[in-house]
Structure formats: structure tokens, C-alpha cells
């Protein structure tokens, strides 16, 4: 007979076992989207089910202008699990690529010079420019996150750090492409 097939959940649990065994510093990047939400919940469930006595770092880049339902979801998950999460909610005016302006190549969330038109206030407990000595005005959002990873590793005095990012690799595999070209 053939091998017993494992499902995605079982394989994820095996990987989490290795991660939580091998790394002293684990950080999940959580945008509030489906992929990062599933990953964060898998980690939360793993910690609780295995009764681990450690906290999980969560890195959330708060872009100021987000759907209210996404903000509510992020707030709800972080609050409900604050006993096991060490949250780094980042509200920094790094550069962010934009395609909504003919005049600007980028915009800045939480730009202090534009405070009068902010969509909302900085959430309580968020980390701002003052918390990050490596931040510069020239920094792009993804450049910031690379520096953040090094900063967190040093701050935690970690031996081995693991940064988890939930990204779908295959979507909608049940759909089929038409066999004849469209006319």
C-alpha cells in the first residue's frame, strides 16, 4: 500500500513543531489579511495547545488607511491573545509605493506634516519613529521591515530568529482554464 497522505493542517503542525523547537525568537508578520491571519492563528493555537511558556512576537505595519473591518479584525485578534503575544504595531511614516497619484511616486502613512488629514489617530500602544533608532525619512516600508528584523533580533538578545510571513502559493486550484480561446 502507499504512504498515508497528510493534510495541510498536519504538515503545518509539523513545521511549527520544528520552528518552536529550533528558534528562540519567533515573529509573525500580520497584515490582517487572510494569509497572515491563518498563519498567526496557527501559531496561537500551537502555543496554547502545547502549553508553551513563551510569547510570540507579532509585527503589524499599520498603514493608517485600511479597511475598517481589517482594523477591527487586527484589534480583536491582538486583544484576545495579548497574554501570549508581544505586539509591535508600527505606525511610521516610511515611504509606500502609490499608483493613485500622477504627481507622487509614494505616500507616507502617519506623516506628521499631514496630521490634519490623517484618516484616524495612531492606535494606543503603537510604536512610532521614536522607538526605532534605525529609521530614516528615506526608508521605504519593506526596507524598514528588514531593519526591524535585525533590531528585534538584537533587542531580544536572540540566538536564532525566525520571521514568519503567510503567503499563498496556489489559489483557486479548482478552477479550470477554458480549452478554447475567447472570440
Residue spans of the language-model regions?
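ATP-dependent adenylation/nucleotidyltransferase module used to activate substrates
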Residues: 1-181
Amino acid at each position: 500500500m502507499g504512504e498515508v497522505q497528510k493534510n495541510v493542517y498536519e504538515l503545518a503542525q509539523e513545521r511549527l513543531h520544528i520552528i518552536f523547537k529550533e528558534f528562540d525568537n519567533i515573529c509573525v508578520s500580520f497584515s490582517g489579511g487572510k494569509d497572515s491571519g491563518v498563519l498567526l492563528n496557527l501559531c496561537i493555537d500551537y502555543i496554547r495547545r502545547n502549553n508553551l511558556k513563551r510569547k510570540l512576537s507579532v509585527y503589524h505595519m499599520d498603514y493608517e488607511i485600511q479597511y475598517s473591518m481589517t482594523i477591527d479584525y487586527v484589534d480583536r485578534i491582538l486583544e484576545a491573545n495579548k497574554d501570549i503575544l508581544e505586539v509591535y504595531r508600527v505606525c511610521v511614516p516610511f515611504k509606500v509605493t502609490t499608483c493613485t497619484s500622477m504627481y507622487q511616486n509614494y505616500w507616507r502613512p502617519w506623516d506628521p506634516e499631514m496630521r490634519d488629514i490623517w484618516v484616524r489617530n495612531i492606535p494606543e500602544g503603537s510604536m512610532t519613529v521614536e522607538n526605532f533608532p534605525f529609521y530614516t525619512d528615506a526608508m521605504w516600508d519593506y526596507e524598514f521591515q528588514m531593519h526591524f528584523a535585525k533590531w528585534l533580533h538584537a533587542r531580544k538578545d536572540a540566538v536564532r530568529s525566525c520571521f514568519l510571513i503567510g503567503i499563498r502559493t496556489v489559489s483557486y486550484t479548482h478552477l479550470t482554464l477554458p480549452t478554447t480561446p475567447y472570440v
